[in-house]
Amino acid sequence: MQQERTVKVSKYLSKHLRHQPERIGLTPDEGGWVEIDALVAAAAAHGFPFTRQELDHVVATNDKRRFAVEGTRIRASQGHSIAVDLRLPVATPPPYLYHGTVARHLEAIRAEGLRPMNRHDVHLSPDRETATRVGARRGRPVVLPVDAATMHRDGHVFHVSANGVWLTQHVPSRYLRFPAPH
């Protein structure tokens, strides 16, 4: 499968499994799962045909493991803006997690901390490298270390998705380490 096609199918899956399943006539269950055959048929009916083999390739090769397959069903691993309950167990985070962003967001983050915005949870990375890649999608990355151990000790709840993304409702700015001003 061509890389360009892989990216297009992946973006299509993300859009319709995380944000707009109704646009192609899908109704995920409470856990965000849809039948793969229904997804493939709906995509074809709405002008974006792909095969089960292409879908399997996208799932297997996605470096961020954005999708989970269970039997005949598929869902996005996290990042939904639609109402879903991923039923992720509560997890004890490592001492530090990381958030990738860009400089233009730092003032708001200092004032409000990290908020989920249009998603259900704040997404945190387990390492600086991953957070750097996340931040780089929007420009020159800035990585903010998160004192996850102290947050957890203070009662904040963490979950970890199947693809290793750490999730929490909010990260108050007192738990963040900001870069020194230039």
Curated annotation (Swiss-Prot):
Family designation: Belongs to the KptA/TPT1 family.
GO biological process: tRNA processing; tRNA splicing, via endonucleolytic cleavage and ligation
SUPFAM superfamilies hit by this protein: ADP-ribosylation (SSF56399)
One Pfam family of this chain: PTS_2-RNA
EC number annotated for this UniProt entry: 2.7.1.-
Keyword Zinc-finger carried by entry: no
Stored Gene3D superfamilies: 3.20.170.30, RNA 2'-phosphotransferase, Tpt1/KptA family, N-terminal domain
Protein function: Removes the 2'-phosphate from RNA via an intermediate in which the phosphate is ADP-ribosylated by NAD followed by a presumed transesterification to release the RNA and generate ADP-ribose 1''-2''-cyclic phosphate (APPR>P). May function as an ADP-ribosylase.
Entry keyword Chaperone: no
Protein name: Probable RNA 2'-phosphotransferase
InterPro entries for this protein: Ptrans_KptA/Tpt1, RNA_2'-PTrans_C, RNA_2'-PTrans_KptA, RNA_2'-PTrans_N
Enzyme superclass (EC): transferase
Domain of life: Bacteria
Lineage, top ranks: Bacteria, Bacillati, Actinomycetota, Actinomycetes, Kitasatosporales
Keyword line: NAD, Transferase
GO molecular function, one term: tRNA 2'-phosphotransferase activity
